[in-house]
Regions:
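Structured, active/binding-site neighborhoods that engage oxygen-rich ligands
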Residues: 1-263
Length: 263
């Protein structure tokens, strides 16, 4: 039976794999294993804002037993300001997210459709969140309909995967069936929410294991940690946390922080 743990550890490992390569151009590197330093100079196995914000969401639901956007916002601020839900404190945060945490209002313009809400959304698949509640959680930082609807589709697909649906069927159900036949060159890996969503599904559909999926995600380049975080969360659901290479799990930092937030 698939659990939240499968998704969250799948995400954390994918995130950590991608951190050293963030912002690097596609095909300017090849990721084959867990490594450190790189873009942010962090030790191997360090996850980023993607996983920290997902853990804040998880911890809120664990304590309250319901989806509460105001409480989640407070926990996001605790992460940013106090280093909660992290190993070494904040070292990366998106512009839209940073502005929203200051103002208390999510960005609602077309230019605010980055992947900063999608990256933390998969855990909501393991709650009773309605579509409107998923949108409300996205809107904490990313309030435009494009970002909110992408999060709704992500939760729907994740729930299908957790129920045993194939990656192809889940992608088709959320209007992304085209990724099954798309060439790599058609997949974009920057920070736009729909590009990240398509890239994560493409990696899942076109590979046959957790390891293959997250490596494919990182090697798309650019926003490597977020693409691999979302793809890794979905692959964790499909293949289970037990499928994650042992050496990667051993290298993952902050496992105790992660475990404490699960429900």
């Amino acid at each position: 039976m698939t659990t939240l743990r499968d998704a969250v550890f799948g995400q954390a490992v994918g995130d950590a794999l991608g951190v050293p390569y963030e912002f690097r151009a596609r095909d300017s590197f090849v990721c084959t294993d867990m490594t450190g330093r790189g873009t942010h100079g962090m030790p191997a196995g360090t996850w980023s804002d993607d996983t920290s914000m997902a853990l804040a969401l998880c911890d809120s639901y664990r304590e309250l037993g319901r989806v509460d956007a105001d409480d989640i916002l407070a926990r996001f601020r605790a992460w940013r300001d106090e280093g909660a839900y992290s190993v070494d404190g904040l070292f990366d945060i998106g512009i839209t997210t940073s502005i929203a945490l200051d103002s208390g209002r999510g960005g609602a313009g077309k230019r605010d459709n980055g992947n900063g809400s999608l990256m933390r959304t998969v855990p909501l698949a393991f709650t009773d969140a309605t579509d409107d509640e998923v949108r409300a959680v996205s809107a904490i930082t990313h309030a435009h309909a494009i970002a909110c609807d992408a999060c709704v589709d992500c939760v729907r697909a994740a729930r299908m995967l957790a129920s045993g649906a194939s990656a192809e069927r889940a992608a088709l159900a959320v209007g992304m069936g085209w990724v099954a036949t798309a060439p790599r060159g058609a997949i974009r890996s920057g920070g736009y929410v729909l590009d990240t969503w398509a890239a994560a599904l493409w990696c899942l559909v076109r590979t046959g294991s957790y390891e293959e999926c997250v490596l494919a995600a990182v090697n798309l380049g650019e926003d490597t940690d977020t693409t691999a975080a979302v793809a890794g969360a979905l692959a964790g659901i499909v293949y289970g946390a037990s499928s994650i290479p042992r050496s990667w799990m051993n290298a993952l930092r902050g496992k105790d922080v992660t475990e404490r937030c699960l429900f």
